[in-house]
Amino acid sequence: DRTGEASVVIDLAHSLTSETIQAAYLEQTAPDEISGMRNTSAWVNNQPIYFAARFSRPIETLTWVKEGKVCRDTVRLDGEKLQAVATFHVKAGETIELQVGVSAVSVGNARFNREHDLIGQDFDAVRKKADKEWQSLLSGIRIKGGSPEERVNFYTALYHSSVVPNRINDVNGEYRRHDMGIGRTGKGKNRYSTLSLWDTFRAWHPMMTLLDTAFVADIVRSALDIYEITGELPVWPLASGETGTMIGYHSVSVIADAWMKGIRGFDGGKALEAMVRSAEKNTKGADYYIREGYIPANFRKESVSCLLEFAYDDWCISRMAEALGEQDIAGRFARRARNYIHVFDGSCRFFRGKGDFMRR
């Protein structure tokens, strides 16, 4: 509200979580632009994010800071904890706007994303466009009845359900693969990450088969792309890596659900191959599950939970195989799916851990 100096800090040293900064750089690439990259490791390793930030007018004074110390006579900083302070002389009521493009591939792609999405628009125009898109998405389901509070709860939950997964391909289709190479999507297709599969395979993914079949096909293709690189379907992928979080191999249920509901746009035979190979991986007690039909509770924590989710996923594989006419695979996984009976205790009508235990 008054004439004076206004500054914007681009702070690559700051993090909301306990991430390790592996590498970073900041560079002035135009009188009104700062670009750079930060590569971090935390839940997964190697999460490079490139950016290109353009101000609404040329920068008047640019101060570089590395490891807390001011650096002079440079247009680029390389290191880990980096900051840039862009300063402007402003009149009372004047606003400095900053348009930022991001990419997991390159600064060039970040700049292209920014120009594609934001060129010719100010903050208010972008805000109105975002509001319109959210209104369109939330209008995809219309409900009747219930109290005002219940309807607010419903649409709030629908909003939350649309925050992730994240589309990670750029406007030109390029994206960072799990081997850190660069892939490219086909025209009209998208590549997604942040697939919290253990949390979402039961309800969210089935809901999406009703709301957006093209999106579901993109999710399946994303999972198969990860399989092509790693030899295994994703469990809980983030950015360009795998967290390995939670139990089961629930990509198979997402793929089977899509196929059984008539959603195509991916190779069913390749999908079945990926499902079978992922189910044969020796992770989280799967070796006992495959060999013995149960997971000893004294050898593996979460043994019952792991078994039940393996069994459900195996049932999904059997259904997919049957739909594709692969009867041998269907029979094998249908038998594996019955492993749940090995931990069902009829005396209490509940599932219980099984193993060799010493009496106290």
What do the PLM-derived regions correspond to, one by one?
Residues R2-A6, L16, T20, I59, ...:
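A generic secondary-structure signal for well-formed alpha-helical elements
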Residues S193-A321, A334:
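Aromatic-rich carbohydrate-recognition surfaces in CAZymes
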Residues F154-S161, A223, M275, A337:
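Short alpha-helical scaffolding segments that buttress acidic/His motifs in well-ordered protein cores
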Residues D1-Y192:
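Beta-sandwich/jelly-roll carbohydrate-recognition scaffolds of carbohydrate-active enzymes
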